[in-house]
Amino acid sequence: YGVNANDKSYYKWGTWAFKIPVTVDKNLRKTIDLSEQEIESDIVKVNSISITPFDMIVDVNYKIGNWNDYRVVIYDETGQIIQIFQTTVSEDKKTEKIYSQAPSSESNSIRVVVEKPILEEKEKVENSNRSEIIYDEIGKEAVFDKVIPIK
C-alpha cells in the first residue's frame, strides 16, 4: 500500500530460501574414558561422561529399581551444585541421561551423588475409582558418591 496518494504498490515474487555453510568442530565434545576407573556401586554405575564448553551429559545406569527411585546431584570441584537442564530415560527405565551445564574449563573433577529419598506414608486418599498414598520425604540416603576426574 502507499503512504502518500501518489505512491504505488510493488509486489516482488521469489523465494527467501538461502543456504549458510556451517562446519561443526567435533573436537569440542570430550568423552571421558571411564573404562580404567570403577565408577560404580552395587546400585549405580556411571556409564559415560561427555563434556563440551556448553553442556555435560552424564549417563547413569541403575542396577536396582529404576530412575524415579533416585535423585542425582552433580557438584563441581568447588562443591557448587551444577544445574541440571533435563533428563531422558531409556524404555526399561534403568538408564538415565542427565543433561547439565558444563563444569568450568579449569575443573579437574566432578562429584556425582545419587540419593534415594527415605519416605514415610503420610495419608491414604480413597476416591471412588482408585486409592492414592501420599508420602513425606523424611530423609535421604546416599547410595553412590564418587569424585570423577574429567581431565
Go through the PLM ranges and name each one.
Residues 1-151:
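Alpha-helical, hydrophobic structural elements that either
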